[in-house]
Amino acid sequence: MRFRNPVRRALRYVLVDRHRAELRAHVEEARALEKLGAEQTAEMQRQRLARVLTHAAVHVPYYRDLLPQYGVLDASGNARPERLAELPFLDKATLAEQFDRLRSDDADARDWVVNRSGGSTGEPTRFVQDRGYRAWAEAVKVVRDAWAGIRPGDRRALLWGSARDLFEGREAWKTRLRRWSLNQLWINAFYASEEAMASHLAQLRRFQPTYLLGYAPNLHELALFAERCSTRVPSLRSIASGAGTLYPHMRDDIERGFGAPVFNRYGSREFGAIAGDCELRMGLHVAAPHVIVEVIRPDGSRADPYESGEIVVTSLTNFSMPLIRYRIGDRGATSDRRCACGCGWPLLDRVEGRMTDTFVHPEGGIVSPTGLIHLAGALVREGWIRRFQFVQESVEEVTIRIVPEGETATAAERHGDATSELTQAVQEMMGPRSRVRIQFVESILPSASGKHLSTICKVKPSPGATLR
C-alpha cells in the first residue's frame, strides 16, 4: 500500500519531498533523542530552552523587556533555564495584544507564516510559525506514528471537521493532489447523520486505510454505528484520537467497533504535536525535543504528579514567535512513571479536556463533569442516545441536550427512567440548589473547529477557584 504507484511517488516528490531535507534531518535527530534516558532528556530540554530564552532576550521585543525582570538572564546575558517557573504565563489575550512585539525581529529569515487556532472557545488566536518549527512538529509526528506502527506513505484516512482544513467542494486542486500523493483520504466529520456515517464506512472500506485519525467523539460515534451495522474496516491496523478528550469508555467502544487499537494524541494549532501514546499506552509521552509541558495549580505553582491542573506549554523550536509558558486552555496531569518502552520523554498521565469543560459549583469552586460523561456514555452504549451535551447555563442551571435514536417527540416518554438517572447525577454533582432541564433535540452543532463539545460552561469561575 506504500507508494507503489510511480505517478504517486513522482507527485509526492514534486509537492512534498523536495522541500523536506530539513524534515528528514529532524526525523533522524528525533529518533536518536527518543532513545535518551530521563536524565539525558531533561538535560537536552534544558539546553534547548536556554537557546530559546537567549534568542528571545535578544530578538523578541516582548521578552527583551520581560526576561531581565525575572532573573532569567545572568550578568553576561546568558539564559538560566532553571528559572523558567518564575516567568509569568502567556495567555491568549496577551498574545493578541502583543502580537507584533512577540514576533522575532529576525523572523523574515525564517520563512514564517501566520497560523490560527480553531477557535472552539471563542475567537481564533493568531500566531507565527516558521520553517524550523514546522519541520520539528512534523518530525515528532513521524516518531509518534511509529509508536502506533504507522510508517510514512501508509494509507491514512482522516475523519476531520475543521472548516479551515476541510470543506467539501472548496479544496484547491493542489491540496487534493497533495493528499492523493500522500495516500490520504479526508472525510468530513461535520456530516454525522446515519446516511453520512454509512457513506463514511463505505469510503473507508474502498480506500482500505491502515490508519484512521479523527476527533474522539466522531470516532466514537462512527465506531458505535459500525458495530450496530456489523461493518468492519479490516485493513485498519491502528486508530488515533487526535482532538477532543478520549475517555476510557470511548477508547473501549472504538476498539471494539473497529477491531484495532486506539492511540491517544494531544496537540494544538499553536504547538502541533505535544504528546501521544507509545505502543504500551502507559501515558502520553511529551514530545520533548519540541515542547516543555507543565501542569499548574490555580495559584501558579506546579502541580504534583497525577494532580489535576492547567496545562502550560513552552515551544522549543519556534524562534520566530517563541511561546513561553503559554496557557493553552486545557486541563491534565503529569506522571512520574518511567515507561517500559525505553523512551525517556516525560509522561502526561492524562489530558482531561478544556478548562472551560469544568462547571462552577453553586457553593464555590469548580467541578469536573467526567462522571456525567461516563454515565451518558453508558446510555449511548445502551443504544438510545446518539449524542449528548451538558450545558451550564447559570450557576444553578444545567441543560442536558440529547439527540435520541428514533422519534425526538416521544423520547421523553420512552426514556423517562434513564433521564431521571441523569438528572439525579447532575444534582448530586452540583448540589441541591441546581436545576436540571432535559432537552431532546434533532441535532447538536459542532464548534467552529469541528469538534463536538460534550460540556459547555457559560459561567465564569472565580479567580483561583479549585476543584471540589
Give, region by region, the residue ranges found by the protein language model:
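Conserved AMP-binding/adenylate-forming
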Residues: 246-338, 355
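Conserved adenylate-forming
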Residues: 51, 162-289
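Short, well-ordered beta-strand segments
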Residues: 157-159, 312
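Generic structural signal for residues in well-ordered beta-strands
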Residues: 156, 184, 262, 293, ...
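AMP-binding/adenylate-forming catalytic core of the ANL superfamily
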Residues: 212, 317-432
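Nucleotide 5′-phosphate-binding alpha/beta core
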Residues: 1-116, 122-138, 142-155, 162, ...
